Each structure stands twice: as C-alpha cells, then as structure tokens.
Amino acid sequence: MNNQESKSAGPALIMKGVRKVYEVGSDEVVALDHADLEVAADELVALIGPSGSGKTTLCSIAGGLLTPTDGTVVVGGSDISDFSSRELTDFRRRSVGFVFQSVNLVPFLTARENLLVVHELSG
C-alpha cells in the first residue's frame, strides 16, 4: 500500500476523549483523563512515561482488553467503544495481536481473570 492509499483508508486508530476510571473501595482512580490519539496505518508510535502514567491502560483499551469509562475508540474503522464482552473477544481474535513486555500478571485482574484472558486470546 502506498502513502496515498493509506491516507484514503483513514486512520488505523482514533481515540477521542477516552477516560478510564477504576473504583478502588470507595475511591476512584483516574487512569486516563480525556486522552486523544490518532494513528495512521503507516505510523509507528512509542508511548513513554513513568510507571502508573496510563500507558498500559491506553494500549489495553485500544486493543479491546478494556472498555473506556467514557470516550470513543475506533480501530480500523470499527467503533469498539461500546462493544459487549463477546464482541470484544471476537474483535481481539480477528484483529489484534499483543506482545507483552514480560510474563507478568495484569495487575488490575484477579488471578482467575489473568488465566481466562490468556485462554480467550489463544482462541
């Protein structure tokens, strides 16, 4: 695909006003606060920031592992913002590949959920 074709095909990823809030007891932790990002199909993006700055949360939402609390996420022309759990699983199986930086548990999932996510991703 040449540059002209990739531009006419639209962005590979659009995130607008994305918020992710976790409830921790009676408190709320804001992991993302109105994040905006647009990535072209032929573009490479590096996320750099300190631990706890929201990089993993942003990637997890873009890849359909998490749903945003608010905002819009469009991947390859499909708005996945309000996908059900089943639709997200299908989306990940068809469209997403993850390479995690190390073999660690996902900290915001229970041990059972960590095992189930590996099972779901493997098909």
Q: Model segments located where?
A:
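A short, flexible loop at the N-terminus of ABC-type nucleotide-binding domains that lies
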Residues: 8-12, 21-34
